[in-house]
């Protein structure tokens, strides 16, 4: 393939980002990668099909990119990702402007499909379902040079009643530890300091290979890789957290004292309707245990409001939980009715207006909690990874802050500081979600 210009538009979650980075690497040797789709002859859209708003964004993006065939240089439109895997034939009929459609297990056909279309105009449509394949290999990072996401498993076995992911991504399958470690070593050699481990459920890592959960062993081995400074864990189901994992987080200096716990709800009746394999008591007990065992741990969660049948009493129970437990970070999503899920067939679907009201109530409550928590940080000194400059101020993150979803720490410019450095910052002021501070002491790289 001649050096044709290719642009990739990646939508959705960080797991999708990794798929995009794998595709970019495959394309790089035979194509010129450009950031602006208006300049590209080949445009690839990696879609999200998880919830209604994500589907709408994906379809709108596909249609916008398709218009570039008339207004700009686009000759080939490739669409891939969760939306194509989920809707297959429907999408093909809905958007005939697509030239190539690939499912989430078909990225190995990307380059050849583009070549065939450019040569003969023959369209290609693949959507293979796989419960065994895991997309892995070399990547071109789209994150800052000091941070990278590493997928440790694919798929999900939970089959929550509201979620279509198992039907899109297949059953849970862990990557081999040696492959993960090799990837981390390569990333560290490129200058990556922060490794963020992701999966649909990171806490289940190894269960399918070893018959037991071995995330704690993986953390221990990754921490031995030269150049890795921080290891961050996302998507940890509270009911699957083991004593060994708690001990590893507690005692391993490279593991951020930070856990993302996708709780979703707290009322036992709602949890049961959701198909969650946990209870209110289990969730509260593990939160208390984590706070007792791991000094300074930051806990983040995501909640769903407006699940079918959610009563005022169940919602009040959720508000009471948020108010009493006071989690450090919290995001709220309105329930999205998804085709192919049992929750979509449930009676007592909640009006959109009520969902919005409940979402707002939780966020206002959490805003106040976050403001109080941040006030307590004034005077504390943190290691901060420097990320950039906004309005003559540097900004970065400490161990309590995950990229893009949490707040930031702002501090005055310092001529000795470079983006990607890890430095010490003393907090002097606090806001609802962000902190303000000054560079403290010498540079700590």
From Swiss-Prot:
- Family matches, as Gene3D superfamilies: Methylthiotransferase, N-terminal domain (3.40.50.12160), Nucleic acid-binding proteins (2.40.50.140), tm_1862 like domain (3.80.30.20)
Query: Which species is the source of this protein?
Result: Clostridium botulinum (strain Loch Maree / Type A3)
Q: What class of enzyme is it?
A: transferase
What does the record note about the cofactor? Binds 2 [4Fe-4S] clusters. One cluster is coordinated with 3 cysteines and an exchangeable S-adenosyl-L-methionine.
Give the binding site residues for [4Fe-4S] cluster 1: 13, 48, 82
- What is the recorded name of this protein? Ribosomal protein uS12 methylthiotransferase RimO
Which UniProt keyword terms apply here? 4Fe-4S, Cytoplasm, Iron, Iron-sulfur, Metal-binding, S-adenosyl-L-methionine, Transferase
Gene encoding this chain? rimO
Q: Which catalytic reaction applies to this protein?
A: L-aspartate(89)-[ribosomal protein uS12]-hydrogen + (sulfur carrier)-SH + AH2 + 2 S-adenosyl-L-methionine = 3-methylsulfanyl-L-aspartate(89)-[ribosomal protein uS12]-hydrogen + (sulfur carrier)-H + 5'-deoxyadenosine + L-methionine + A + S-adenosyl-L-homocysteine + 2 H(+)
Main localization (coarse): cytoplasm
Q: Which GO terms describe its cellular component?
A: cytosol
The Radical SAM core domain covers which part of the protein? 142-372
User: Which terms under GO biological process does the entry name?
Assistant: tRNA modification
Q: What is its EC number?
A: 2.8.4.4
Subcellular location per UniProt equals: Cytoplasm
Q: Which family does it belong to?
A: Belongs to the methylthiotransferase family. RimO subfamily.
Record-linked InterPro entries:
Elp3/MiaA/NifB-like_rSAM (IPR006638), Methylthiotransferase (IPR005839), Methylthiotransferase_CS (IPR020612), Methylthiotransferase_N (IPR013848), Methylthiotransferase_N_sf (IPR038135), NA-bd_OB-fold (IPR012340), Ribosomal_uS12_MeSTrfase_RimO (IPR005840), rSAM (IPR007197)
The taxonomy runs: Bacteria, Bacillati, Bacillota, Clostridia, Eubacteriales
Source species, domain of life:
Bacteria
- Give residue ranges for domain TRAM: 375-441
This protein's record includes keyword S-adenosyl-L-methionine: yes
Q: Which residues form the MTTase N-terminal domain?
A: 4-119
């Amino acid at each position: 393939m001649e050096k044709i210009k290719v642009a990739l538009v990646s939508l959705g979650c960080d797991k999708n980002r990794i798929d995009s980075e794998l595709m970019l690497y495959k394309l790089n040797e035979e194509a010129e990668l450009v950031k602006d789709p208006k300049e590209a002859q080949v445009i690839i859209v990696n879609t999200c099909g998880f919830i209604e708003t994500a589907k709408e964004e994906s379809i709108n993006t596909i249609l916008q990119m398709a218009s570039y065939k008339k207004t700009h240089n686009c000759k080939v439109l490739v669409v891939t990702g969760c939306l194509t895997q989920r809707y297959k034939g429907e999408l093909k009929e809905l958007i005939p402007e697509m030239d190539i459609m690939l499912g989430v297990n078909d990225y190995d056909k990307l380059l050849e499909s583009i070549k065939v279309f450019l040569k003969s105009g023959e369209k290609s449509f693949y959507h293979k379902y796989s419960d065994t394949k895991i997309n892995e290999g070399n990547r071109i990072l789209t994150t800052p040079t000091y941070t990278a996401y590493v997928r440790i498993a694919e798929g999900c076995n939970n089959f929550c009643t509201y979620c279509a992911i198992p039907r899109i991504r297949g059953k849970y399958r862990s990557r081999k530890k040696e492959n993960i470690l090799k990837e981390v070593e390569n990333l560290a050699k490129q200058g990556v300091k922060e490794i963020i481990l992701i999966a649909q459920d990171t806490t289940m890592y190894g269960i399918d290979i070893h018959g037991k959960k071995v995330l704690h062993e993986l953390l221990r081995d990754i921490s031995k890789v030269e150049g890795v400074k921080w290891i961050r864990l996302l998507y940890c189901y509270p009911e699957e957290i083991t004593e060994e994992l708690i001990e590893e987080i507690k005692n391993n200096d490279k593991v951020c004292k930070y856990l993302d716990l996708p709780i979703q709800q707290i009322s036992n009746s709602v949890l049961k309707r959701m198909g969650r394999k946990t209870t209110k008591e289990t969730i509260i007990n593990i939160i208390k245990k984590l706070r007792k065992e791991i000094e300074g741990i930051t806990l983040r969660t995501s909640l769903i409001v407006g699940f079918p049948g959610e009563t005022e009493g169940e919602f009040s129970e959720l508000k009471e939980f948020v108010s009493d437990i006071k989690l450090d970070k919290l995001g709220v999503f309105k329930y999205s009715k998804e085709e192919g899920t049992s929750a979509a067939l449930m009676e007592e679907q909640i009006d959109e207006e009520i969902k919005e009201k409940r979402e707002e109530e939780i966020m206002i409550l959490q805003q106040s909690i976050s403001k109080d928590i941040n006030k307590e940080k004034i005077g504390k000194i943190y290691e901060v990874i420097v990320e950039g400059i906004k309005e003559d101020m540097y900004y970065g993150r400490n161990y309590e802050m995950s990229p893009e979803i949490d707040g930031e720490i702002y501090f005055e410019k310092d001529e000795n500081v470079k983006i990607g450095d890890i430095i010490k910052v003393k907090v002097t002021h606090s806001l609802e979600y962000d902190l303000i501070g000054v560079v403290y002491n010498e540079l700590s790289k």
